[in-house]
Amino acid sequence: MKQGTDVYKIGYSSCNICIISLISVSILSVCMSFIKNQEWKDIDTYFVNFSNFEVMPEVIGLITIPIVLFVASAIYCSLDYEKRFWGIIIIIFSTMATVILELSYFCEVAIAFPMLNSGITKGTEMLLFANPNSVVRALKNLGYFILTLGYSFTFFALGKSRMESVIKKIAIVMGGLNFLFLLNIFINNSLFKLGSVLSCNFLLPLLMLLLGYYFRNKMIVNKRLEKKQLDNRIVENTTKSYYADF
């Protein structure tokens, strides 16, 4: 029971961190797009106007993205034995997404921006998220596609309680929007982009919020069971001590 409570605590805390991270990255990205308010032209034009503040969303992502693995692991541990196959699928997809996203964020944070700060522009255009045709932008899109696809498998993993049913509905909608997300990777279209924005910036944080509530409820139930078992042991030991006196 104690192990289960610890798992739910980790899952609950990890969901909260993911929510804060995803919302922070989204807000900062939107703010930077409004501040810059210009389309990508070339690396020389970008170099004249670039600011180190632009890398903040990627710094946050680089630090916090691995937390999704804690959430996936907590989901796996909370499942019944016959449902744990889907938990493994979620962990696999989360691991793939984490590796890809960490690579994309690392390229800009640890390679591109230090080069720009040193006055080197050659070769950096493919390592900047500001360039819509860069390698890191493609990796980021692929990473979030895999991440949202992986968490859409919670539809198969969870049970039939009211909270779990709501989570499953969010998961299946997110899975459907992933088709638009996938098309957005290959085709630059406003409708497809809307699907990716809804999936990553709205439904994924919402799913994390509901999963956090799910872990919180599990944690409360588990603590009540622990307390009940402890009370039963106290009564049992008291009874044994009482009869031992005779």
Predicted regions: what is each one?
Residues 1-237, 241-245:
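Hydrophobic, aromatic-enriched alpha-helical segments typical of multi-pass transmembrane helices
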